[in-house]
Structure formats: C-alpha cells, structure tokens
Amino acid sequence: MEEVCEGKEFSFPRQEEDVLSFWTEIDAFKTQLKRTENLPEYIFYDGPPFATGLPHYGHILAGTIKDIVTRYQTMTGHHVTRRFGWDCHGLPVENEIDRKLNIKRRDEVIKMGIDKYNEECRSIVTRYVAEWEKVITRCGRWIDFKNDYKTMDLPFMESVWWVFSQLWEKNLVYRGFKVMPYSTGCKTPLSNFEAGQNYKEVPDPEIMVTFPVIGDQDNAAFVAWTTTPWTLPSNLALCVNAKFVYVKVRNKNTGKVYIVAESRLSALPTDKPKAKLSNGPAGDTKKANPKAKGAKPESAADSYEVLEKFNGASLVGKKYEPLFDYFSDFSSEAFRVVADDYVTDDSGTGIVHCAPAFGEDDYRVCLLNKIIKKGENLVVAVDDDGLFTERITHFSGRYVKDADKDIIEAVKAKGRLVKTGSFTHSYPFCWRSDTPLIYRAVPSWFVRVEQLKEKLLKSNEQTEWVPGYVKDKRFHNWLENARDWAISRSRFWGTPLPIWISDDGEEVVIMDSVEKLEKLSGVKVFDLHRHHIDHITIPSSRGDEFGVLRRVEDVFDCWFESGSMPYAYIHYPFENKELFEKNFPGDFVAEGLDQTRGWFYTLMVLSTALFEKPAFKNLICNGLVLAEDGKKMAKKLRNYPPPLEVIDEYGADAVRLYLINSPVVRAEPLRFKKEGVLGVVKDVFLPWYNAYRFLVQNAKRLETEGGVPFVPTDLATIQSANILDQWIHSATQSLVRFVREEMDAYRLYTVVPRLLKFLDNLTNIYVRFNRKRLKGRTGEDDCHTALSTLFNVLLTSCKVMAPFTPFFTETLYQNLRKACKGSEESVHYCSIPPREGMEGERIELSVTRMMKIIDLARNIRERNKLPLKTPLKEMIVVHPDADFLNDITGVLREYVLEELNVRSLVPCNDTLKYASLKAEPDFSVLGKRLGKSMGLVAKEVKEMSQKDILAFEEAGEVTIANHLLKETDIKIVRVFKRPDDLKENEIDSAGDGDVLVILDLRADDSLVEAGFAREIVNRIQKLRKKSGLEPTDFVEVYFQSLDEDESVSKQVLVSQEQNIKDSIGSTLLLSSLMPSHAVIIADETFTPKETSDESVKKVPKLSYKISLARPALKFNEEAVLALYSGDVKSATGLQTYLLSRDHSNLKSEFQAGDGKITVSCIENVPVATVVLGEHLHLSVGDDLLSKRNA
C-alpha cells in the first residue's frame, strides 16, 4: 500500500475527479455491464425528465437513490441495464418556444406553420443534455447516456401508438366533452394532477343573482351564489338538493320575494348588508377550492318573512327567466330546475347556477337531465385563449376574468343583483404559464380509468412501496377516486393520436404501427410528428364515394408517453419481445412524492389496462428538497447554492450521504443546508479516512521494521483471542446481513444510519481502543493480527458502502487492493460480501454495554469538569444482572479502565446499596391498551415498593389492577443514594434507568502522579503533531526539569516510567543523556497556569521542557578505542564516519549483517568490524536499556 497524506491535506472533491478519470480510463461502467451480461436481469425504469431545464437537488436525490439500488443489485449478482431517458414533448417545450418567438395565440402557430414550429421545438429539446450529463456523472451515477431513449424518437412513438391501439381494442377509449382545468396561457387542458401543482392566494368577486320563477304568483325568484360571474352568460340550469327544505321569503323592506334553502336564509342580505359573504357556494364547482375569509353574516330573521316551505324535489322542472339571451336557442330544454346531491348547505344559498361548459358537476347534471346531449349540442362560448366567442355578443373578444366587473354591472343594470363582494381564496394557476386556470369543457379522447378502478387497486396490492404509507393511503386513495383520463391535447409538439376518421365520422381506423400506416396510405413514413403525417390520408374501405379518412388533430398528453415508457423505450412489441415478456413487471422505480399523481399513476393505469398487472414491483418515493428557509427552491429567489458549487467544495459523496441520511428518503421534506454537507465530511468521511490512514501508516511501519511487505491475514483464517477483534468481526457480519436484508426490502432509511453507526464504531471503538496493538506496542504478531483485522474490516466496509459513496470507497479500495492478490480492478466490480462465519451476538452485546458504561462515566466527568487526563480512583457499576457485570469486569475491564483513566472497577449487583428504585408506567405503550384504566394502573405502578420492583425485575411481569404488565410496560429508574460518609463533590453518578455508574472523585498522591504523567504524554503527542511527524516516525523524547527542586519531577518519572513508555512507545529520557551530536526536531517549554479548576489544582505545579530529537548513535568510547588499540585518531574517524551515515540505512546494514558491519572505507584508518551493542547503540534509549539489563 502507498503512503497517504494527513486528513487536513486530503481533498475529497479532488480525489473524486481522480476517480472519474480512472473510471474513464478503464471504461468502468461499460466493463461492469459486460462482466454481468450473463447474470439474471434486473429491470429498472428511469423516469424521463425534461432537458429544457438544469438538474436540481430533487433530481440529484432521486438519481442517487436509483444509483444506490442499481449498484447494489449489480453487486449482488444481477445485470442491470441503465438507460437514461428524456421527456421531449409537451407544454414545457412549447412554452419555451412561445416565449422565444413571442407567440401568444394558437392561430399564430398555424400561421407560422406547424412544421417550422415543431422543428423549433425539436431544436431545444436537448439544449441542456450536456449539462445534465456533466452533473449526473459528477454525482457518481452510472447510467448510459449514449444509448438513451427519447420520447420524440420514432421507435418510442411507434410503441406509444401500439399501446393506444390495445386500449382501443379493449374498448377503453372514447371521445367526449370533459370539463377540465384549462390553461388559457398554454391553450390546452391540464390533467388533474397538473392542475394541483400551483395554487395561489388571490382575491375573486362573489355575487348573488336572481332567476325569476316563471308563473309564480308572488313573483318569486331563485337566488344563486357564484364566484365566477363570467360563467353567468352560459347559464342553462339551476340545481337544488331534493332532500333539502327550501323557503320562499319576502324582504320586509323591499317586498322582493326570494327562494333559498332554509338553512341558508342567513346568507341573504339584511338591511345593513355586509361587504363580505359566506365562505363559498353550495356545491359551486366552477370555483377552485374556495377558502373565503368573509365575516359571519347577521341573522336575517328580522328582515324576511317566510311565505312558504317546500322540499327541494318539488322545485324540479320549474322554469325560470335566464339572465341573458345568448342561449335562447336552448329554451326548450334549458332554463329549468334540476336536483342533485352535490349541492350542499354549508355555504351559498342551496341553489347552484349551472353552466355545463364550465363546471364538471354542471356538465354531469345537465347531461343526466338531458339539457345537453353527450358529444352533441354543447356550446362552449369561450375560445382557446379564454376569450368570449361571438355568441356572447356584448363581451365578445374579452378575456373572461377581465370581464367579471362588467358582467356584474350588466346584472345590476337588469335589477338582478342581490349582493356583491369579494373574498380571498386558494386558486389554481397553470404550472407552466403561471396564468389562472379556468374550468372549461373541451372535446377530448379519454381512457376509461373509472372502469378499471378495481383492477387498479388489485395491481397496487401487488407492489411494494417505501415508505409503505404512501402506497396504502395516498396512492390507494388516488386510485379509489380515479376519473377517466383525458389523454389528448390540442397542441402541436407531441406524439400524434393514431386515429384516422372519415368526414361523416362513421369510419375510424387506428394505426398500431408505422407499417400499417404505410400499407393503408401508400406513403413512406420516416417521422411520426404532426408536420410529417397530418397530410396523410387513407381511402375509405367503403368505396371511393365515401372519400378519405384524415387524422384527428390532437396529440397525446405527454404523461401518456412517459406512462408507456416500459414498452416504448425498448420498442416493444416490435423488438425485444422476449426480453420484455420475461422481465415484466419491472423490478424498480423511484421518483418524488409528486409522482403519485403523475408518472407512478400513469404507469399503473396503462400496465393494468394492457396486462392487468402493475408496471413495477418495488418503488421508493422520496420527499421534496426545499430551500433552507422552507420555501421551494427557485432560481429567481436564489435561495439555494448551485449543486456543482457544493460538490466542488465538499465532494459528491458528501452530498449523496447528506441527502439519503435524511427524512427525505421517507417521503418527508428536507430543508437543504450547505452546513449539513460539511457536517457529513467532518463526522463521517474524515474519521473514516483517518482510520484508513492509521492502517496504512502502521502497515508501512511494520514493513520497515520487519523488512517484508505487509500481507494481511485473510478474515476467515484470523484466529484472534482479542475481544475487540472478535467484536468487530462479528459486527461486520451483522452489518452485511442487515444491509442485504434491508436493501432487498429497499429500506434505505434503515440501511444508511446503520452503515454510519458501524463506521463510527470502527473509528471510535475499534481503532481508538486498539491504538497500542495497531502501533506494535504489544508485539509484532499481535500487531499483525490487529492490522489484518482492521484491513479486512475496511475492505468489507468499502464494498458494502460502494453503492452509497462510490468515489471514496474506490479511492480506499485502490490502495487496499495493493496488499491483496487477485483483487478486482474496481471496487464496483466486487460483490457485496456474503456472511463469513457466525455473528457473535453475545460479544456485540458486551461491547454495547461497555460503551454505555463509558458514555455514562464521561457524562460524570464532564459534569464535574474532570478531563480524561485526570485519573480517578474507582468506578462502581450497579446492575442486577450478573451477565451484564461480567461483560464489564471480564476481558473488557482493561479497555474501560484505560479509556476512562480509572484505577479500579467494582461491580455491584445489589441495586439497593447505591440506589433507590422507582417504577414509571410507559404511557405511550399502555395508554391505548388500558384506556380508562390507565389512571388507576399508573397510580399503583408509581406506588410500587422497592421489594415489588425487584420481584418484577426478576419475574419480568406483574399484575396490577387485573392487568398483566410486562417489562416493556414499566420503566425502572435507579436513583443514586450518596453514602453518608462522602461529600457531594467527592462522588457522583449517572444512569439510564437500566444501569448506574458511580465515580469516586477523590484524589490521592498516586493519582496526582498518574495525572502528571498523562499530561506529559499529552504534551508530547501534541508536539509531535505540531512538528508534522507521522505516527510511524521514531524520535527520542527528552525531559528537562526547569524547577529548582527537580526531585518531584524525577519521582513522578520513576513511578510512571512504564505508563509513559506504553503511551509514547519509547522511554522518556532525561535531557542530561542527550549526546551533543543529537539533532533536535522540536522542543517546547511548559509552565503551570493559575486556574480555578479543582482537578488541576491537585496536579503538581512543575515547569519542564520537552525535546524531540532524531535517534542518535550512542558510542561505547572504550570499546571503540580498543578496536584501534588505543589510537584516538582512528577511533574518532570511525565515530565521525558513522555519524555521517543515514540512520535508517545504517540500521538496515546492521540487520543484514546480523548485528555487525565492516568499515573499510575510511582513509588512513584500519579496517574494523563494528558490533551493535558492543561498540555502539543506535539510540540513547537502547543504550540506557542495555546498561539497565547489565
């Protein structure tokens, strides 16, 4: 393995760029696909985005989820084809061209020419493809852009034709009028899910108008309420509820007689009318989600006299005088009262005015009552631009919303205005043009979705969603209330409907392929867009006298195209028939929550209609990524950092991990914070990198000391008696099992936290607690075992983490693989490791318990301002379970003592010796179960005696107030009892309700000395770091007392010599032993500071100097002189020569010569054999040890 730099010098973004270059060099993605082509297929459908805008964090999130799953499936033995796709048709593209060419009206497109318009559309479809590829590739996602699919390509469009033809054959398609949300800005109807994407709070007028009853003896008039005055010119009926009671009332002041629902009499104006009205009309469907903010009307009891009461059913059939005469030709069928249950009495007047061309319920009710006929005499008096047609003579050419005020004035002039006002409510706007939507009847082609409802619900049950509640609630409810789907659009740039109709409408031919069109028309077809096929006619099969069939003008809703993607992207059924039929439904899809009403829905509808099965088996639904302020991310608001800017600063892996380790993978919203990405770097990647670097450093040290390359022992054959080796091996197996189980269930939200917890345990438990072993302080064999364990765990974690953080794992893997024979060229060619060996649940539990004890003890230290360098005398662990105490006081005892800097650990299973017990009922568990009994049970639980609680802990259950309570129902809290002979500042405790940890805070002389020794060690380590030394760099450390009385420091150094040596890896030398030729690397002087910290006050106030020096040769002067029979000049020449040599080379020569070297290169000095240990030592420390041993 190669040396690696310090974490602070390591650039995550730069190493990712290097990895990208490496992947390009080895053609990694293509190679992976080639290597897996004979493995079972895993079918992934990638929803096509529009390329008319740049990718944002929502795209990156969904792309990351897709990349993780497909990488994982590849690494678990599948061939995963990943083709990117583009949604090329529809409003987004046309809007861009309309803005570019300043096109406002449909007829401007016709005048320009559909051919020119469509080619303009085609020219911008792939405008941002390069940018998309750049961002997606930089994010680490592997997907095929070269073999992408486009919804505008002929093979794709041909398959869409085939899908439609199958629906036609199943009698699932019909033509009719449907009142739909309509965008006057884009001149097209919108689907219901499109209409719900852009609501705004806006003011609108609201009025009450009269419709005089023909032939009524009291000259009564029906009163209707509406928020859409512009629909009044198209009124054809009034609707009541047959079950309601209606009243005929006379205004006591004006004498006017009105008919309204009895329960809505209060809505009529009083003598002092209010400016604001009620919250909304009774069942008025021409408004959109009204939420009026009007004042509550006064009582009308004093202003009106009730003349008559009658049931709504009795009003049915009564004729009334229309407001306007624009529809006088409908008089025989229209201008009468009908009844329907959609009329409510929670607002309005209980009477709804019906304009069937502009209200969904209006249309249904008028059709049901034969005021209009299906597909025939419906007159839509508003054109595609939202302007009144010539039929509405007084307002012809006016935009409907702009005409509201004048229409109100016209009603007032006719004496028909009862009341007027305004209110603010939530109203839908076009998600593309940002213009207010209207509801308008449009001729359209429909898929009979309502007819498929039961099959859709059945298909939904065959799928697995993450999170599940989105499927069971949101999507299920949407399917349950599904309406027929208008699949046609009166637009230009899209896949044309393959419907050819004769002039008399009697003959209809559906094209299911290009071949059929060419055969019937005799025209060669190379493109299916409108300007290439609109002119194509086919002869009538009835004979020449019936003329020809022409294509209808409409194109498909682009959602129909994307819903056809599973078939069209592989040109089914014209190609890949076996591939599709063998692997349908697909295995996996993933998009945002908004697609429950979009792509997920259209996929489900079409696959159920075609095959009576879902299009996919598994689905991950992510939430919305919002700006930090909680608002939707928007370029114009500049409320989010550009994705590439964040990636260039912190790396794509950090962005990926930040996104997928958040609520957004549970379909909840995420407020994106750049600081959160930085947090991932600091909390995950830097510790992970440092653990890896620590391995490399110590493996290189072992190589240097042993003279042979480091070859790790295989994980399966490591035989280690070390408890932490066994633990991390077991934890790794548990991790592999958990990741496989949860990833197979697509639960990323459980996998990622577990992965990060494992990395945290690896760095903060295994590496931290094993530093001495890993540094070789416990012997070469034990060091090799520890390093092999760390190596194998890091290698396994690289493979398991590879789908999540593809860059960093590749970087680590490329260096780690240098120590492995026969390793794969890339980590992404590897398999997710299988479980190797048994998991040690007992060992994992033991270490978990150890960490619980350590965390509680750290809390006590922090609370008492006692840093870890301050040694403590004793820790007591109180727990009733002997196994728990054995875990802590057995093989893990030394780790606990060393980590907490405590001298002794005392187990105690007598829970009442140091604590009193309290029982607390778990209300969250018991509340629902016990209901009204909860109060009594809670009272008795809290009153349980110490004896009762101990008995409950032993038995695991207790009966209270005739209810059997288990361990999970009651929380036992241990409250610390301080011994009477100790003061409050001499002892403290911490507990978690299960275990109690007690620390003796008193100091004694031995502890003070140990504390001073720990301080010295800490100073040395900081000086090493400050000097830029690597952990593998060997230096000698010298101590010099600066106090007049050096006896105190010497006493400490003697008593703590072994502890210091264990910590720094060498003997701490007195400065008096430093040779004159020693090379000092760094030194620093330390003097005690005044402090109020009681723990520090007890440490002796000593001044001293620490020096770090390169290892210096220590000569035995007498033995060197004897080599030359007392010739001082020759002896001095030898010493000078040896001091000039590189220390490490000299050491190697002695090792090679079995402790001897022959020196023959000194001019005028005889040849001499120098013996290590006899004539010199390679360091002062070696010399000192030799003298002591002698």
From Swiss-Prot:
CDD domains: Anticodon_Ia_Ile_ABEc, IleRS_core. ATP binds at residue 635. It catalyses: tRNA(Ile) + L-isoleucine + ATP = L-isoleucyl-tRNA(Ile) + AMP + diphosphate. Transmembrane segments: none annotated. Its main location: cytoplasm. GO terms for biological process: isoleucyl-tRNA aminoacylation; post-embryonic development; reproductive structure development. A motif ('KMSKS' region) lies at residues 632-636. It comes from the Eukaryota. GO terms for cellular component: cytosol. A motif ('HIGH' region) lies at residues 49-59. Its EC number is 6.1.1.5. Signal peptide: none annotated. It is found in: Cytoplasm, Cytosol. It holds the Pfam family DUF5915. GO terms for molecular function: aminoacyl-tRNA deacylase activity; ATP binding; isoleucine-tRNA ligase activity; tRNA binding. Keywords: Aminoacyl-tRNA synthetase, ATP-binding, Cytoplasm, Ligase, Nucleotide-binding, Protein biosynthesis. Residues 271-299 are annotated as: Disordered. The keyword Nucleotide-binding applies. Belongs to the class-I aminoacyl-tRNA synthetase family. This is Isoleucine--tRNA ligase, cytoplasmic. It comes from Arabidopsis thaliana (Mouse-ear cress).
